[in-house]
Amino acid sequence: TGAVFFGVALALRPEPGGSVNFEFAEFMTSSIFKVPVSLILIAAVVLFVWIPYRRSVLGRAAYAIGSSEHAAYMSGVPIARAKILAYALAGFLAAIAGLMLTFLTYSGAAKASLGADYTLNSIAAVVIGGTSLFGGAGSAIGSIFGAFVMRTVGDLLIVFDINPVLQPLFVGIVLLFAVSLGSLRLLRIKNKLDLYR
C-alpha cells in the first residue's frame, strides 16, 4: 500500500510546490528555555495521546490483537474499533511527522520521495525500542529511545567520516540484530511452553 500511496502522491503533484509560514516554521524549530520545541511536542504526544490510549480499553485491545487476533476475538475484544483507532492514531502521528519535516525544510515544496529514507529508520527505531514485529509488545518511550539510538548511530557515522551512502547498510545491520534478538526471545518462550505439553 505504501507504493500505491507514493504513486498517487506523484500523480497528484509530479513537481514540488507549496509554501509554509516562515515565522511558524521558525518557532517549531526553535527552543523554549533551551528545550527544543520538537522535544516538547514529543512529550505532549506521550502525555496526551499515548498514555490515555495505552490505558484505554481499545489501547489494551490493540495489544491483545497484536499478540493473537484469534484469541482476542474469542475473548470478546472489539477488534474492528481497536484497529480503526490504531490506524487513525498512526495516520495522525505520521501527519505530525510530515509537518515537522516541512518545518525543518522551511518549504512546502517537498518532493514526494523526500520521506522515503525515513521508512527504514522509523521501523528500526521502534524495533530497537522494544516493539515486537510479531505484535503484542512495545511502548512510546521505547520507540523514542530507539529513535535517539538511530540518531546517535547516524551522528557517529559522520564523526568517523564514513560515507553517508553506507548509512542504510548500518541501519539495516542494526535492525537485523534487533529483530534477531526479539526472535530468539520468542523462540525461548516457545521452547519453554513446549516442555509443559
Spans of model-derived segments:
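Transmembrane helix-bundle core of multi-pass membrane transporters
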Residues: 1-56, 82-85, 104-115, 162, ...
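Alpha-helical transmembrane segments of integral membrane proteins
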Residues: 37-41, 82-89, 141-142, 167-170
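Transmembrane alpha-helices
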Residues: 78-103, 120
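Membrane-helix/interface signature in polytopic inner-membrane proteins
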Residues: 48-88
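Transmembrane alpha-helical segments in multi-pass inner-membrane proteins
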Residues: 94, 109-171
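Cytosolic-side transmembrane-helix boundaries in multi-pass membrane proteins
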Residues: 47-48, 74, 78-81, 104, ...
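Hydrophobic core segments of alpha-helical transmembrane domains in multi-pass membrane transport
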Residues: 2-10, 41-51, 87-98, 128-131, ...
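Short amphipathic alpha-helical coupling elements at transmembrane boundaries
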Residues: 25-30, 61-64, 70-74, 155-158
